[in-house]
Amino acid sequence: MEGIDMIEKFNGIIYLIVFIVHFLGYAFYAYRCVFKTQDFCDEYAVDHTAAIMIRFFGSFFIGSVLVALYIMFIRPNGVEGAWGFFNLVFVQNLTAFFVGIYSIKINKLGHTEKTSDEGIYAPGILMILSAILCYGLADKIYS
């Protein structure tokens, strides 16, 4: 019965899956930035002296994942009235997408042979997923 309640809180299984996929993406980057920092630096040819700032960046993902877990498992009303969180996540993804385009296609500061378009695609996908959530859960998050 509890699983059915969770599905209902998310307006159906589709939005619950989108929510889970989105925040699994956040958890993936949080883990890599905070706990696998050296591997992260090596993959993107970033000097290890940037580790503190990379972990700082990852901490924002951790905060969002913790709030998502709270909404999913603890918060009595689930997503109801959580418009601030969902809108903040969308705006963060949107700005990361545009900053990625600027950084990879326009400015090119710090480009190496390991530079890829991941800085555009990852936030672009996350932006689309968060937009789907804002739209699909609008009746609940704005109530």
Regions found by a protein language model. Give the residues of each.
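Core segments of alpha-helical transmembrane spans in multipass integral membrane proteins
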Residues: L24, Y29, A51-F73, V91-F97
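Hydrophobic transmembrane helix segments
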Residues: V21-M53
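Physicochemical signature of membrane-embedded alpha-helices that form the seven-helix bundle of GPCRs
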Residues: I14-V21, M53-F60, G84-V91, G119-A122
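Hydrophobic transmembrane alpha-helical segments in integral membrane proteins
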Residues: E2-G25
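Loop-to-transmembrane helix junctions at the membrane interface
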Residues: R75-V89, E113-D117
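Hydrophobic alpha-helical membrane segments
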Residues: F85-S103, P123-S130
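Membrane-helix boundary connector in multi-pass membrane proteins
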Residues: F98-G119
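Juxtamembrane boundary at the C-terminal end of a transmembrane helix
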Residues: I132-S143
